[in-house]
Design a protein with these regions (language model features):
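Repeated scaffold domains used in trafficking and secretory/extracellular systems
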Residues: 50-58, 101-112, 160-173, 203-212, ...
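Beta-strand-rich domains and repeat architectures in extracellular enzymes and scaffolds
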Residues: 43-79
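Residue position within the beta-strands of beta-propeller blades
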Residues: 65-66, 118-120, 180, 219-220, ...
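Bacterial signal peptide processing site
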Residues: 20-22
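Short loop/turn segments that connect beta-strands within beta-propeller blades
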Residues: 85-89, 142-147, 189-194, 234-238, ...
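Short, solvent-exposed loop/turn segments at conserved positions within beta-propeller repeat blades
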Residues: 72-78, 125-135, 181, 222-227
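C-terminal motif of bacterial Sec signal peptides marking the signal peptidase cleavage site
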Residues: 15-18
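A short beta-strand motif characteristic of beta-propeller blades
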Residues: 39-47, 90-98, 148-161, 194-200, ...
Length: 289
C-alpha cells in the first residue's frame, strides 16, 4: 500500500489557553484575549494504485483534487477527480474520469454549486511518428453528477502565441469566467468558454493567480526589474489594475487563494502567508519547515 500525504489547502486554528485560566478571565476580572497559532493539517491517503495528487482547490467545505492513477497490470492511466469534506473527513471520487493516456488536466476549479471546471489537454500522435506532435486544449464544465455542461476547444487561441501556448494556471471569478495564465499573458474566456481577449502583463514571469476574499482575481508576477508585484486583473478592461507591493515570492507555486483574516492566503516553498491589500502587508501564518 502506498501512503500519500496531502497538505490541506486550509489550516487549523488551535487556541492556546492561558495557564490555569479555563474560564477565559484574568485575575483583574477582565476578559483575557486568547491567542491562536495556525498549524498545517495533513490528510493521509492510502491507495492500492500508483497515484499522484495535484490541482487542489477549496470551495466551501470541500477540498477538491485530481488523482492521477496508473494501473501497472494493464499499463493504462486515468485522472480521477476527488473531494474531501473539511467538516466530517469523508472522501469521494466524483463521477468524472479523464483518460490520461495521451492527455490530462492542466488545471481545475470548483464553484459553490459543486460544478467542476477543467482545462484539459490531449496529445494526438501523427501516424508514423513516435512522439506526440499535436496538442489540443479544451475548457470543460461538469456538474456534480458528472454531466458535461460545456466543452470549448481553445487550441487555436492558445497557439496564436508560441511563447504563451500552454496553460500555466486557471482561475474563475464569481461570474464563472475563466482566467488562464501562460508565461507572460493572461487569456480571458466567458462562462461559456468563448474567448474575450487577453491581458499583456509585460512580465518576466507570472508566478501565480488566485481569487481574493473580495471575489476578484489577482495576479502575482515579476516586473521587469525582477521585483514581485501583485495586480488585480480587470476582465472588462482587459488590463491589469492597481499594483500592490510587499508581496511574498511564491517561487512559481502559484499558491494564492481567498484569505481568512485578510484578503489573500499565499503559499510558498517554506511558509504560508496572509496578505492585506489595504495595508500591502504580509504576515507569516506558519512555516512548512
Amino acid at each position: 500500500r502506498k501512503a500519500t500525504a496531502i497538505a490541506l489547502a486550509s489550516v487549523m486554528a488551535m487556541s492556546l489557553a492561558a495557564c490555569g485560566k479555563q474560564d477565559g478571565s484574568n485575575q483583574g476580572g477582565q476578559t483575557e484575549q486568547k491567542e491562536y497559532v495556525y498549524v498545517p493539517e495533513y490528510l493521509e491517503l492510502d491507495d492500492n494504485t500508483n497515484s499522484s495528487y495535484s490541482n487542489m482547490t477549496v470551495q466551501g467545505d470541500k477540498l477538491y483534487y485530481t488523482n492521477y492513477q496508473w494501473d501497472e497490470a494493464s499499463g493504462e492511466s486515468k485522472v480521477v477527480i476527488g473531494a474531501y469534506s473539511l467538516t466530517d473527513g469523508s472522501r469521494e471520487d466524483l463521477p468524472i474520469t479523464i483518460n490520461a493516456d495521451g492527455g490530462g488536466i492542466y488545471s481545475m476549479q470548483a464553484d459553490a454549486e459543486g460544478n467542476i471546471y477543467t482545462a484539459e489537454f490531449e496529445w494526438n500522435a501523427t501516424e508514423g511518428d513516435d512522439a506526440y506532435t499535436q496538442q489540443t486544449t479544451v475548457l470543460h464544465k461538469y456538474d456534480a453528477s458528472g454531466t458535461e455542461l460545456m466543452a470549448q476547444d481553445i487550441t487555436d487561441i492558445m497557439q496564436q502565441d508560441e511563447n504563451n501556448s500552454y496553460v500555466g494556471s486557471m482561475c474563475l471569478d464569481d461570474q464563472g469566467r475563466f482566467y488562464i495564465s501562460s508565461d507572460s499573458l493572461i487569456r480571458l474566456f466567458g462562462s461559456d468558454g468563448q474567448f474575450q481577449g487577453a491581458v499583456q502583463t509585460d512580465s518576466q514571469w507570472i508566478q501565480g493567480m488566485g481569487k481574493a476574499k473580495d471575489g476578484k482575481v489577482y495576479l502575482a508576477y515579476y516586473d521587469q526589474s525582477g521585483n514581485v508585484k501583485l495586480s488585480q486583473i480587470d476582465f472588462d478592461g482587459k488590463a491589469l489594475g492597481q499594483t500592490y507591493d510587499n508581496f511574498p515570492n511564491t517561487n512559481g507555486n502559484g499558491g494564492l487563494c481567498a484569505g481568512i483574516d485578510n484578503d489573500l492566503l499565499v503559499n510558498t516553498d517554506t511558509a504560508l502567508y496572509d496578505y492585506s491589500l489595504a495595508d500591502q502587508k504580509t504576515t507569516e501564518i506558519l512555516s512548512w519547515l
